[in-house]
Design a protein with these regions (language model features):
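Conserved beta-hairpin
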Residues: 50-67
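Conserved active-site alpha-helix within GNAT-family acetyltransferase domains
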Residues: 131-149
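Conserved acyl-donor/pantetheine-binding loop and adjacent beta-alpha core of acyl/acetyltransferases
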Residues: 67-101
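A short beta-loop-alpha structural element at the N-terminal edge
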Residues: 2-16
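Conserved GNAT-fold acetyl-CoA-binding loop/helix
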Residues: 22-42
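Conserved beta-strand-loop-alpha-helix junction that forms the acyl-donor binding cleft
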Residues: 101, 127-137, 155
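Conserved GNAT acetyl-CoA-binding A-motif
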Residues: 117-129
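Conserved acetyl-CoA-binding loop-helix of GNAT-fold acetyltransferases
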Residues: 103-115, 138-142
């Protein structure tokens, strides 16, 4: 598996991947996180246009997972019910989704984020997830992230927030 920047040619595959992820979440006790059809096609296209959407592809360059990686400070992380280990610059992983074809997806994403962080001289990676997203919470903990507290999205929805200090 390889990770590359998504392009407009990947939009149909991205729609398929996010639909599969919504089904998986609903079937695993998390029907509300993306239950409203988010991220929308327009949100996905915008992330692709920004160059922040990445895809994991197989040997035929077919995307099977997607995520976004940002180097700018996330405004929703400015206030936390808890505490971040530090206030140093960080990368943020968002919108992790998979069609469940490939295995080791989150480990590959974290390895990729670590490489990007090292290249940018950034010493932390942050991620958040819904309280009902137990599979993701397990993967986050397994990858070595520390639970830091609760943040709130722009719409007020709470998310469990984690940081990996590199």
């Amino acid at each position: 598996m390889q990770i590359r920047t998504a392009t407009a040619a990947d939009l149909n595959d991205l729609a398929r991947i996010y639909a599969a992820a919504r089904r998986f979440m609903a079937e695993n006790g998390n029907p509300t996180q993306w239950g409203d059809g988010r991220p929308t096609a327009a949100e996905i296209a915008e992330t692709v246009e920004q160059g922040a959407c990445l895809v994991g592809v197989d040997e035929h360059d077919v995307p099977h997972f997607a995520f976004s990686l940002y180097s700018e400070a996330d405004p929703t992380y400015a206030t936390i019910e808890g505490a971040w280990p530090n206030d140093a610059p960080y990368l943020t992983i968002h919108r992790v989704a998979s069609d469940s074809v490939l295995h080791g997806v989150f480990a590959a994403i974290v390895a990729f984020a670590r490489e990007r962080a090292a290249a940018a001289d950034v010493a932390s990676v942050r991620v958040d997830t819904h309280e009902d997203n137990k599979p993701m919470q397990h993967l986050i903990a397994k990858a070595g992230f520390a639970y830091c507290g609760v943040i709130h999205l722009a719409d007020g929805d709470p998310r469990l927030a984690y940081q990996l200090v590199l």
